[in-house]
Amino acid sequence: MAAPVPWACCAVLAAAAAVVYAQRHSPQEAPHVQYERLGSDVTLPCGTANWDAAVTWRVNGTDLAPDLLNGSQLVLHGLELGHSGLYACFHRDSWHLRHQVLLHVGLPPREPVLSCRSNTYPKGFYCSWHLPTPTYIPNTFNVTVLHGSKIMVCEKDPALKNRCHIRYMHLFSTIKYKVSISVSNALGHNATAITFDEFTIVKPDPPENVVARPVPSNPRRLEVTWQTPSTWPDPESFPLKFFLRYRPLILDQWQHVELSDGTAHTITDAYAGKEYIIQVAAKDNEIGTWSDWSVAAHATPWTEEPRHLTTEAQAAETTTSTTSSLAPPPTTKICDPGELGSGGGPSAPFLVSVPITLALAAAAATASSLLI
């Protein structure tokens, strides 16, 4: 009858664990959201618990050291970004959740950087902004555009959250534009503004599809072509001029050419056989500033291909030499018996002709082996 006791103990422990789990994981009120400045000190109270209440603190599910507590309060010194998280205070015995704080560590915003530019003149312009340093917490921006005393609409860019677009209402206006921007977050607020004339912010996008090619039979020429930026809406009414720069990769110094019109140029002073880098910029003929440089194009001037080493004269000379080496040696004349003098006898011509015949046979065999 003693066997059921351990089972009863296990059942009690399991029930207790279930109660604790339910208390620690049961639905609770939304945590209190709190923002604190980077580097500061913060004290987090355990809700309405007494100062001397026995509590345990956790952050993101991990127990915190008891030496961080001042009574039931949690004290954090020199806040760092890593201190951000969900802090929870539990009753030490029952593990009943007393309080939760969602802590965000960050900075107040510094003065924003604001700029405006017209790359679609004369349609309109856009303004963009950013903070010089991150705040690590959410920021809210508010933009106001004035043309004289008239408020203009600044349409949000669908792709870039820190940009908006304004349409020109009156071209060639002498009235200045004023753009103001304010930024705020849970830790502070800041603002800035700029004022400008319409023509001062005109700046096209860089030229597109820059291509450089060698010129056949011209070792010092490169032909460069490009296209007007696709964002420039009316190049006929508002023509662009171009600025071309180029240099060989072996040198650091650029050479420059300014072109009043056209979308092509031939470089005539390139170094033969050296790879070049070429870029082009654009500007309205009358107003505004130069665009940024285009994507770089690379090209090497034309070079003559090396000729074959064997020329026609060398081929003829080689053929003659080969033919001569294969010809048999001159035939040795067989002496007449009468020319041999006395004592030669009838066998003399036979004795003389044997070495000659052998020599001819050897020469023929040599020639045959060479031809094979």
Curated annotation (Swiss-Prot):
Residues 1-22 form the signal peptide. One of its GO terms (biological process) is suckling behavior. CDD domains: FN3. This is Ciliary neurotrophic factor receptor subunit alpha. The gene is CNTFR. InterPro entries: FN3_dom, FN3_sf, Hematopoietin_rcpt_L_F3_CS, Ig-like_dom, Ig-like_dom_sf, Ig-like_fold, Ig_sub, Ig_sub2. The keyword Magnesium does not apply. The lineage of its organism: Eukaryota, Metazoa, Chordata, Craniata, Vertebrata. Keywords: Cell membrane, Disulfide bond, Glycoprotein, GPI-anchor, Immunoglobulin domain, Lipoprotein, Membrane, Receptor, Repeat, Signal. Glycans are attached at residues 60, 70, 142, 190. Disulfide bonds join 46-89.
